[in-house]
Regions:
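C-terminal edge-of-domain segments
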Residues: 1-15, 121, 125-229
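Short, structured beta-strand-loop surface elements
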Residues: 71-132
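N-terminal short leaders/motifs
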Residues: 1-17, 60-72, 108-117
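A generic structural signal for short beta-strands and their flanking turns/coil linkers
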Residues: 39, 54, 61-63, 81-85, ...
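General beta-strand recognition
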Residues: 64-66, 86, 160, 169
Length: 229
């Protein structure tokens, strides 16, 4: 993932966090760290008058997010048409267990990006974008795996989305209980969520003795420490 060119996302009305604004962040370091750790984005747009939200893998290069899919995909066609896009990612860090059901919550980190998609037509940018997406999923993987051939490139569409209207929002707190509930004989606190990757499982065509790369054996997502409140 390349560093962004700007230090702060542009503040717009729709990207401004109003509910718990103290949990918001607009600096690109925070936004980029969350984008670089997450694996799946939920991309919302309107297609033929109806709202649609699709989960997609992605990659980030500087100030640009890249999405890809089949060139016959209605989703990619809609994103390439200049439709307004809402791109979101969420990382769950803990379950927040309060003394009342009303005050149960989640500790999380999230990013919302607004913008319009751009169909990538330059062949060199398209190849870089596809490499960016693969490297986002498993850093170093493009050194081992075959590059896409001409027919695979022709069958794939790539959409670019500039990160120029975005916000991050996070919660990293214990339960917030009413004073009257603090004496209840009910356990309260946080239950941390840890994403774990198991040992690699080779498919049946892997040659005997061929071991996975160290980047696979010791695979972990980049992790930014949640902000303390």
């Amino acid at each position: 993932m390349e560093a962004s060119d700007t230090g702060t996302s542009a503040l717009s009305d729709r990207a401004t966090v109003r509910r718990h604004p103290e949990r918001a962040a607009y600096d690109r370091a925070t936004i980029d760290a969350i984008l670089d750790e997450a694996l799946v984005a939920h991309v919302g747009f309107v297609r033929e008058g109806s709202p649609v939200v699709i989960p997609l893998s992605y990659g980030r290069s500087g100030d640009t997010l890249y999405l890809h899919g089949s060139n016959v995909s209605r989703t990619l066609g809609a994103l390439a048409s200049g439709a307004d896009i809402c791109f979101t990612v969420t990382l769950l860090d803990a379950l927040v267990l309060a003394r009342s059901t009303f005050h149960h919550s989640l500790n999380y980190r999230s990013v919302v990006v607004f913008g319009k998609g751009r169909l990538v037509t330059d062949p060199a940018e398209k190849e870089r974008a596809l490499e960016c997406i693969v490297e986002h999923i498993v850093p170093g993987r493009t050194r081992d795996a075959r590059e896409p051939n001409a027919s695979e490139l022709a069958a794939t569409s790539v959409i670019a989305l500039t990160i120029d209207e975005a916000s991050a929002k996070s919660r990293n707190e214990p339960p917030v209980d009413l004073a009257a509930d603090l004496t209840r004989a009910t356990w309260a606190g946080v239950l941390p969520i840890v994403q774990h990757y198991g040992p690699p499982i080779a498919d049946s065509f892997v040659s005997a003795g061929l071991e996975p790369a160290e980047t696979i054996v010791s695979y972990e997502r980049p992790r930014a420490v949640p902000r303390e409140r």
